Every structure is written in structure tokens, then in C-alpha cells.
Amino acid sequence: MSRKMLVTCALPYANGAIHLGHMLEHIQADIWVRFQRMRGNEIYFVCADDAHGTPIMLNAAKQGITPEQLIEKAKTDHVADFKGFNISFDNYHSTHSEENREITTEMYKKLRANGFIKSRVISQLFDPEKQMFLPDRFVKGTCPKCKAEDQYGDNCEVCASTYSPMDLINPRSAVSGATPIVKESEHFFFDLPSFEGMLKEWTRSGSLQSEITNKMQEWFESGLQQWDISRDAPYFGFPIPDAENKFFYVWLDAPIGYMASFKNLCDRTGLNFDEFWKKDSETELYHFIGKDIVYFHSLFWPAMLDGCELRKPTNVFAHGYVTVDGVKMSKSRGTFIQASTYLKHIDPECLRYYYAAKLNERIEDLDLSLEDFVQRVNSDIVNKLVNLASRNASFIAKRFEGKLADKLEDEALFAEFIAQSEQIAAHYENREFNKAIRLIMDLCDKANKYVDDKAPWVIAKQEGCDAQLQAVCSMGIELFRVLMSYLKPVLPQLAERAEAFLQTELTWDNIQQPLLGQNVAPFKSLFSRLEKKQIDAVIEETKALFAAQNKAEDKKGKQKVENTENTAVEPIAAEITIDDFAKLDLRVAKVISCEAVPESNKLLKFQLDLGDHQRQVLSGIKAAYNNPEELVGRFVIMVANLAPRKMKFGVSEGMILSAGTGGADLFLLSADEGIRPGMQVK
């Protein structure tokens, strides 16, 4: 019996471009959705832009446009990118929509009526210049525990301490630089602890990924907390009913955006919205997300739905991050590749196939090895799959006017290919795409071996063997048809071209029905080889793109410095003696490697050469150096006799010196030419 299903992807934030990391999730979901359609299931695939929040409000102001203009431009770009990669959404909407406002307001009122919304007065830091309350991440200052400078308002990335923004020493607004004041404000909280029993039961259902189940157990053990769902004006979002100058936090209305996008589709097509969202719905609901937002989708979202007496997700499918050549995507190396840049140079089906060949059901990072990318695409798609069709089609066209044989040359081999149908289907269903691809390519090898063993090019030279030639080549084309049917969810454009050649639609139901006695069209090139020069073009364009952005930012930074030359500087510290200074062992060090700490918003990890040994130093200057790889080879000054500090993200064996007020306004100290690693600063 046909299943009714609704599938979503995480909503891309409307404050930046789509990159190949985003595309992993959307390709994964699209393959699964296309497979379900081939199996005859009634499935709807929706998404939207996540269009609210302080970052969007501030970015729009920085650009001199309205938030509405910013998110409209982002949506246009995002839709074009997804279309370019053949992501087959039934609807792509925005959280800044009337449907989302109505559903968000309705759900909030329902939660409030059911007693799940609490309110209390909290103290917050307030920017007197911008006249706005400051979220934790928009406050910086000195850690009250370890005295590390330029730390965020909620936790220290040097000593891993957590604290209130009010505890920061010398706090400042990350928006204006002003010293914030403390103001009280009433906030609204979602009572998540009330749903602990339901969430534990949901966790024990056995359908969630084991990694999610284990993580949820950790959160249960540490204790669930009430969730602040409100933000004070000014804020770009939806106003909270009956609460002046209060707005819903972006993470409240973002997942509701799934419902809003589907509601928009229902209103246009006549679908029954309630059938998919009512508490006792027999339909299936699946969310594809990245591992970084499991917390919201496995705790807050199902609890909110349950509190509104709506259905919970059937499952949440999380995936890992994308790395390129074994390391985090890098702007300076040209591997932080935007979808639009990729599409200018490379067929999107290449990436769809490569991701599919590596994706499984676990939450694992996926490495895009550029050399392997080229090799695998050419080996599998061009040399094996497409070549299987081309080497047989030429004989059918020239010798038999495109007509295939009336019977199968090798019924046992055909039966072997058909027998794998349900196993391949099971791999697709379980999101084990790598296993499906491996099995399909094994069959492809068998098909090519069949043609090699039969050698139609030899048969073609033998008199009186036309029937045998037609039978062998028809068999080769028949096996190609079966393989393309299996690969249609992964390679929809190639499948469409194959359908034009075969003059039949590729469906799961007709896989076992051979094209006996039918005609095929004249063969045209189905797929082009992937060349290294195409990869190089993408890398170089990416480097140029971000180099231009950095140049523009540097220009703005210089103008800012020029405009603030006469502003006050920090006062000179208390006087010390020469003996105090002598306690510091300052050394010259050469940067061997430098990379961002993925889990940290502040830290860079340095490997430093001090002449006779090397050291690792973690430094909180990430905001000032967007391209840490460019620091390799540079000489810096460090405090060499500072006791090693065990931090959340590793051990730091010293301190690198820099000057500035903090954040992006930090500058590493360097030395003149001729300096050598290990030299002492005197």
C-alpha cells in the first residue's frame, strides 16, 4: 500500500550563500525522496529560508537595505542553487511569511493555554548607543574566571567556564563597541522539563539514530531547562501576542517554517494540511538535518508539537560535516566552495554521485577528496556505465536501424540483475546509499564483462552472425536500462537522457520488463568526463571570490582605524620593576601550521617552531584572521615560559602576543627580517 510522507531539509539561513556543505544534506534528502516517488509513495518535499534573527537585522543595516530586501535576495539565490543541483522540492518558502506568522502565533497561544509558557523578569545587558538588548553572543569582555580577553557573554573558550554576561569584566557591545548597561526585562520561557517523560519514551522508540539516542540520554542526565523563546525589540521576527516590544526567538519559528511551507503548498494544491499534522496522523514525517542542530530537533521541536497536541516526527535523520581533502573547508585554499561557483564549471550530477557513493545512515563527516572525486566519476559513470550503452548502441543503430532483439540473449544474467532490486531498494530506504552504489557498480562490472566476453566487435566482422550481434548488443543495452533505473534517484538528469535514448520511462515497476523488439533512438553523448582543470577553475574562482571580500573588509578596517586615530586608548597598567619584566621569557616563533578549531567560535590552533622544539598554542584571535592558513610561515612573538593550560579544546603551551581592542581588531606582533625561531626578545 502506498505510504503518505512529508520530508523536510533544515532551513538555510538567509544571511549567506549555499555551499557544498549545505548540498550534502539536500542531495541526501533528494535522493531519498526521488526513490520514494519511484516506489509509488505519495511524498511531499518542502523547505524554506530561515529568515529571522539579529544577524539578519544587523547585516541588512550594514548594507543599507531592509531585512526584507536582504532575505528576498538570499531566497532568489538559494532557489537557483537548489534548482541547479536538481533538488526536487515541491515547495520552497520563507519563515518570513504570513503562513508562518499565523501558525507560530497559534501554536504559542496553544502552549500558553496548556500551561507550558512561563514568564519571569531577567537582567540583560543593554547597548545604550544602539538602544537594544544584547544577546549573549553580541557581548564580549574579559572572562571572570581566567581573565582571558575578548570572550563571549555566555562562556569562555579559553578555560571553558560558563557564566552570566553580567559577570564579564569590562563588557562591551559587539554591535557598537559601547559599554553596556544592565536592564531588566520580562521574558517568556517554554517549559521543556514538562515533556521529559514523553521525550524519553520517544527516544526509546528505537527509530532514532543511535548517536541521537545517546546524546539525548546525556541531556536527560544533565537536566532539561526551560527555554527562553523571546527577544526584545529591536528584533527582526514575529511579535509575541499581548507582549509589547517582544518577539519570538528565531529558533521558535524556524522549525514551524516546515509547517508553513507545507501549508503554502496545501493552499495552492488542495492538499489536506491537518491530515499530515494532526496528533493521530497516519502519515510519516521526516526531517533531514545536520548534526549541529540535533538539540533543537530532538528536544524542543517534538516537545512543542506535543504541547500543541500535534504529531511528532516519525524520525530525524542527521548527517555529519563535509571536509575537503581531509580538512575543514577553507576560503584561502579555495575549498569553501559555493554552490553557484561549482555550477559554473562542473556537472551537478558528479557531486550527487560522489556524495551518494559515500553517504550512509550514520552521523559521520564526509570527505570530498578532489583527486578521488575526478577518478571515481570518470571510472564509474563514464568508463563503466555510459560506455556500456555507447559500445552497444552503435551496432544497433548501424546494423539494425535502432531495433532491439525480440528475446534476451542471457535470461539468467538478466534475472540476476532483477533479483537485486529489493536489496538495492532496502539500501535506499535505510539511507545506505554507499551500499546501493557499491552493489549497482558490481552489477555494472558484470554487464561490461558480459560484453567483453561476447565481443560484439568481433561478431560484427563475421558473416551470417547478425542475429547474434543484435542479441548481444540488445542484452548490453538492456542491462544498461536496469542499471540506469537503479541510479535514477541519484542521477536524474542522466536518467532523463537515458530515457530519451531508450524511448521509455525508467520506473521501479518496469525494471523487470525488457524492451524486446522495441526501437531505441540514435545514441548521443550522455555524460562528459570530469577534468582536473574544471576542479582547478572552481578552486581558483573561490580563492578570488574570498580574496576580493577580504580586500574590501581590509579597506573598511583601515578606514575605521583612520577614523579612530584620535580616540582614547586603554590606560597604562600599574608600574612594574625590571625584575617583574625579567620573569617573562619572550621568544620568536615561526608558524608551522594554523587552523581554526571547528568547535570554537574564537580559537585558532597554532603549531610553532621555537628552533629546538615545537609547541601547540591555542589563541583567541579567530575573528581577526579569517584565513588562518595564510599565517603559515610568519614569525610571531610568544610568552614561552607561561605554564601549559589544559583547555576545553586541547593543551595550550604558551601565549602569542597581539595588540588591539579585541575581536576583529587584533593584530599579531611580528619582527624584522633576519629573525630566527627561538630568538629571545630582550
Curated annotation (Swiss-Prot):
GO cellular component, one term: cytosol
Alphabetic keyword roster: Aminoacyl-tRNA synthetase, ATP-binding, Cytoplasm, Ligase, Metal-binding, Nucleotide-binding, Protein biosynthesis, RNA-binding, tRNA-binding, Zinc
The EC number(s) this enzyme carries: 6.1.1.10
GO biological process, one term: methionyl-tRNA aminoacylation
Residues spanning the membrane: none
Cofactor(s), names only, from the UniProt record: Zn(2+)
Pfam families linked to this entry: Anticodon_3 (PF19303), tRNA-synt_1g (PF09334), tRNA_bind (PF01588)
Family: Belongs to the class-I aminoacyl-tRNA synthetase family. MetG type 1 subfamily.
Protein name: Methionine--tRNA ligase
Protein source organism: Actinobacillus pleuropneumoniae serotype 3 (strain JL03)
Name of the gene encoding the protein in the UniProt record: metG
